[in-house]
Amino acid sequence: ILLNAQIKKKVLFIGNSYIYANTLPQMISDLALTKQDTLLFDQSVVGGFTFNNHCNFPQTWQKIRSNSWDFVVLQAQSQEPSFSPAQVMANTYPFAKQLNDSVKAANPCTEVLFFLTWGRKNGDAMNCPVYPPVCTYNGMQARLRESYMAFKDSFKAACAPVGVAWKRFRNLYPLIDLYQPDESHPSVEGS
């Protein structure tokens, strides 16, 4: 029996500034090291990128095929999954499916992990007039959760419920600000 066996995982992060803010993959790797585990990672992350953008970005495809990844983490643009179900189905779902299917085609053993994000601190003011459910943090968070869980279920993938943990932490520790001043990106504490 191996006691203290080291775990080594290879993870590709595909997303945008929510991932590269505060060098999140390195933070996770450092956390793994505290347990003598190893996280080898790469990333295809560009500020503001949607799943559609990644589907048309050669670097994303190159990185998907560059390794036998244990996990590929897929994180959508922060607002898109909070839009109406019809809009998500038309503008986000097809590209989430294309990325998921491409990861599985490159290596059937890779587990796709959808990174369920958090709502903006006070909701999405820009899109509130056209879709009122996103006018508040709670409304936006509920829509994000619904969309990411639909991706997970539709594609038989996994989901990292980051936004669910974020909401719980926000409720338990309201004095700790998880957001940068833009009320969208994570502070160091948020990451």
Give the label of every model feature segment.
Residues 1-8:
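Bacterial Sec-dependent N-terminal signal peptides
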Residues 8-12, 18-97, 102, 108:
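Conserved SGNH/GDSL esterase-like catalytic core that processes O-acyl groups on lipids
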Residues 63-188:
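Alpha-helical cap/lid subdomain in secreted, periplasmic
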